[in-house]
Amino acid sequence: MSILKVVAERLVIHPHPNADALELAEVGRLRAVVAKDAFRTGDHAVYLPEGSVLPEPLIAELGLTGRLAGANKDRITAVRLRGELSQGIVCRPKALADLDLAAAAAAGTDFAEVLGVTKWVPPIPVHLAGDMHPAEDLLPWLDVENIRRYPAMFTPGEPVVATEKIHGSACLMTLVAATGTVFASSKGFGKQRLAIKEADGNLYWRAIRAYDLPRLAAAVAADLGAARVGVFGEVYGRGVQDLGYGVQASTRPGYAVFDVAVDVDGEIRWLTPDEVAAFTAAHDVPAVPVLYRGPYDEAKLAELAEGVETVSGTGANIREGLVVRPATERYSPVTAGRTIGKLVSTAYLTRKGGTEYE
């Protein structure tokens, strides 16, 4: 899940092909359905992204009482409106009526706090939870931004690697090389430097043991001279999320490495896709499928994000999407951090009965 920012954006307005009273407001590569003539191309408005949780007064102001997602009907999700995918909400809240939204857009002003908008945090089911303890040496995972939201993240033609995005639960494992200490955590707890105590029934620990991840991390540490190694992988299967990939997690959970980070002389470095592939193959640990290597082509990658999964080899369910990285790690001024983005399939966004646990 990405970082929540509520900012003003310059809009490009398109006709809605199926409704005379509606139009499509484009933000980046995302589009949100709006009332006809509410905005013109070049106007600036506030964009409330997917995953935003809105306060009741703002929901009422927007005329959306009872129409949003979640138990409290307060969460923005992707929906189809008259056949067109609508992602996020474009609006001009009364609380910002006196502001110059064009200037705010140029400054990148974040209105989340002013508007009372918060980020939705996925619930943690019992089989993923456990007793927690502080773990300052734990290497956390980061937020992956939506490429359609930030299309300038990659340069056309730059060498990239795209892997399949698996719908499971991210398992963070850190090995401290000097002591052999192993920490396990989730995305959310990892950000707080909290680890889950080892337990037979915990899904993360079951995956760590089943795939002998400490052995992989120890080999990486030895080869690269790392003090700490973070192995980041997706635990998946029936019982983890709604997409099962033909695996019954209650017997042996599915698992695939999607990233590895090392601490060498106090500097954190993310391994390149080729390095991750080499280490996982050498130690018989599954890795997420690589679906594309080559020059960055947004249209081609967006098409590749659709379809069925390739993890099981049987096309057991829809594909969640892609995660795209440069072939060589680099800094992104767009995200002010690591260059890594995702493209999520339309089928995944609009599926019915989906689960979104951490």
Name these PLM-found stretches:
Residues 1-358:
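Core nucleotide-handling region used for phosphoryl-transfer chemistry
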